[in-house]
Amino acid sequence: REREHRRRVAEAEAQRIRELKALAKRESETWTEIFALIEQMQAKPYAEAVRLLVKLRDLAEYQGEEAVFQQRLNRIYEQYSRRSALLRRLREAGLQQS
């Protein structure tokens, strides 16, 4: 039973790493998509932008590039400082400005 649990955890982690590596190949396009979603100024696109930002944060952590990600996130906070709904969603997702 414990062995099965460990196997499932290892499989899940391997899948997560595969997904992060796939995301790394399209990181630039993902940032472009995020800004396009934000520009729509609607709830669903904001939610999708935040979902993608969380994935990019995970990728940055995996690659040891947290500082670079944080700089880009800070720019979003600055560039869209008047979009309270977006900023609230970012904070709720744990994407804090620093």
Regions found by a protein language model. Name each.
Residues 1-98:
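C-terminal structured domains
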